[in-house]
Amino acid sequence: MRTSWKLDHESLIGYGYTVKVIREIRTFIEAEVIKNGERTEIQWGADSAFRFFPLCEDEITGFTLHPIDLAANKLSALVGRTEPRDWIDVIESIKNIQPLVYLLSAACGKDPGFSPTSMLEYIARRRYNQLEIDECIIPAGVYNAAELCCFWREEVCRAREDVLDFPRDKAGTCVLNKDGEPFRGSVKELSVAVNTGDVIFHEGRICGAWPKII
């Protein structure tokens, strides 16, 4: 992580960006990057070697975590950290990756001290007002707090019902369809997919692995 930070920092400076370190600890660096009046925040972190998928190669950022691993990490962060960014990232993951109940299962695979139900009750309390969101999201006004809170409340209510029907012995796995893509159906549809063999409960491991498609 330190090597990546050093190289990225030098590259950004070389391209005329101003880099302001916001927070720095041994395994994590957060910096604000500014140029021509525009700014964004970038984070460098040292992640656990345990994950569901191998690292994904990206033309811009080099290597990144698979979206499901990122979403699982954000859920774990939301349990113990009060950052509006984490909450918004989880909401975006629900919208773009898969329903909350499946992301909870994956997150518990990385943090076995939780079950989907117990983790849900921790994160269900999270909500932020417009001022809190605008302070950490640049530019301000990108997200509407009222809309986010309504969406979050609905998803938490849905997940509370879903965890009751989710297979307990599969908690901690990543739920994929038969093609190895994130499963996005309802829990009732999951039950049907289990019976027809159209779902994969993919387990995490050191350095991750791609699911076996049969």
Task: Pin down the residues of each PLM region.
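Compositionally biased terminal segments of proteins
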Residues: 1-214
